[in-house]
A protein has these predicted regions:
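Mid-chain, well-packed structural core segment of small domains
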Residues: 51-78
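Buried hydrophobic packing segments
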Residues: 44-45, 58, 75, 95
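Short helix-capping/linker segments at secondary-structure and domain boundaries
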Residues: 49-56, 86-90
Length: 100
């Protein structure tokens, strides 16, 4: 299991990490958009911003919510059109061990 990317923040400021977690729960809860759709949007954002680990973690969460590899591929296409080919490279790296 990979190291928690927030381990240092948790050590020096656990309150901010708790705030982040409660915000995450609020933002990604079902509403007008399903949790799955929100996670797919977040995958596209992280791919566009170069966050390989974010793509990986969010894609895993999206899959647990029922996302298919085809849906993930489509959100990476959107990220590519909106942000350039780097989003495909980042998405591919992030999905390396997630999609078989």
């Amino acid at each position: 299991m990979p190291e928690n990317p927030l381990s240092t923040a948790l050590e020096i400021d656990p309150k901010v990490v708790e705030h982040m977690r409660s915000t995450d729960e609020w933002v990604f809860s079902d509403g007008a958009l399903s949790k799955k759709v929100k996670l797919l949007v977040a995958v596209a954002f992280d791919a566009a911003h170069g966050a390989v680990g974010g793509v990986r973690g969010l894609a895993q969460r999206a899959i647990r919510e029922g996302a298919t590899k085809e849906e993930i591929a489509e959100v990476l296409r959107v990220a590519y059109v909106m942000n350039g080919v780097g989003a495909i490279y980042i998405g591919s790296q992030g999905l390396k061990d997630v999609i078989s």
